[in-house]
Amino acid sequence: MENRYAVHPEQVKRFTTEELRRHFHIPTLFVSGELKLYYSHEDRVVIGGVMPSAEPLKLDAGDFLRTEYFLERREIGIVNVGGQGTVTVDGEAFVLEHKDFLYIGLGHEDVQFASASGEEAKFYLVSATAHQAYPTQKAAIAELTPNHLGEASASNVRNLYQVIHANGIQSCQLMMGITQLETNNTWNTMPAHIHDRRMEVYLYLDIEEDARVFHFMGEPSETRHLVLANEEAVISPAWSIHSGSGTANYSFIWAMAGENYTFKDMDFVPMDQLR
């Protein structure tokens, strides 16, 4: 498990591109036959990728969490961004197709990931600390109704799926969903906003090999950018905007954790305040 400490915004003002990427960019999540985990001190979330090959892979706390098992004091949201796969939770199997979600609550000891025959599954996961056990629940993307947002004139027509949240799958603090931009649309989360009571992490998806997303971060008066390729993630502290524009349309999985469980608790930044 790779450790990522929190960083003060005053320090970020002086970061080079390499330093920005080292602290906030997650370049490698999916390696065949491996479980990759990153521990962020921003609200103590764990971000990870699981790509089972011939044998199943078990979610293990390792030495870093200092617990008997991974979900002893945590909850987790999982999205399959690869081929069909199965997540088995204390003996109960959940089959996840491409972009299906699964929430697993506090206290489950044995979580295993497996790929079906054919294309390997890629399980993206975000875990937050938890104080109460909520039921394990699956959400199939084909059965969800998105919110249609944006305008063609602003190049931001998109479909927002809220999955783990106060009015959907219940959790302690974790919120999670996916946003898919339509063809010829490139902007996400613009006008930008911040939410000082929650951190957020984006996983960018559906990006062609020769395309990129320019992810904007930083305080509104001190913005910076990171250039991201397909299946790369970025950590967004509570003080930072989190917006992006691609060379073509794309999707991104968003996940939030922190003090406030209200999705609409955010402060929009007027365009004339961005620098």
UniProtKB/Swiss-Prot annotation:
EC number: 5.3.1.17
GO annotation, biological process: D-galacturonate catabolic process; D-glucuronate catabolic process; pectin catabolic process
Statement: the UniProt record of this protein carries the keyword Metal-binding: yes
InterPro entries: KduI (IPR007045), KduI/IolB_isomerase (IPR021120), KduI_N (IPR027449), RmlC-like_jellyroll (IPR014710), RmlC_Cupin_sf (IPR011051)
Cofactors, names only: Zn(2+)
Details of cofactor binding: Binds 1 zinc ion per subunit.
Pathway where it operates: Glycan metabolism; pectin degradation; 2-dehydro-3-deoxy-D-gluconate from pectin: step 4/5
Binding site for Zn(2+): 193, 195, 200, 242
Reaction(s) catalysed (UniProt annotation): 5-dehydro-4-deoxy-D-glucuronate = 3-deoxy-D-glycero-2,5-hexodiulosonate
Keyword hit for Flavoprotein: no
Superkingdom assignment: Bacteria
A GO molecular-function descriptor: 4-deoxy-L-threo-5-hexosulose-uronate ketol-isomerase activity
Keywords: Isomerase, Metal-binding, Zinc
CDD domains linked: cupin_KduI_C, cupin_KduI_N
Stated family: Belongs to the KduI family.
Record's function text: Catalyzes the isomerization of 5-dehydro-4-deoxy-D-glucuronate to 3-deoxy-D-glycero-2,5-hexodiulosonate.
PANTHER family, per the entry: 4-DEOXY-L-THREO-5-HEXOSULOSE-URONATE KETOL-ISOMERASE
Name this protein carries in UniProt: 4-deoxy-L-threo-5-hexosulose-uronate ketol-isomerase
Gene: kduI
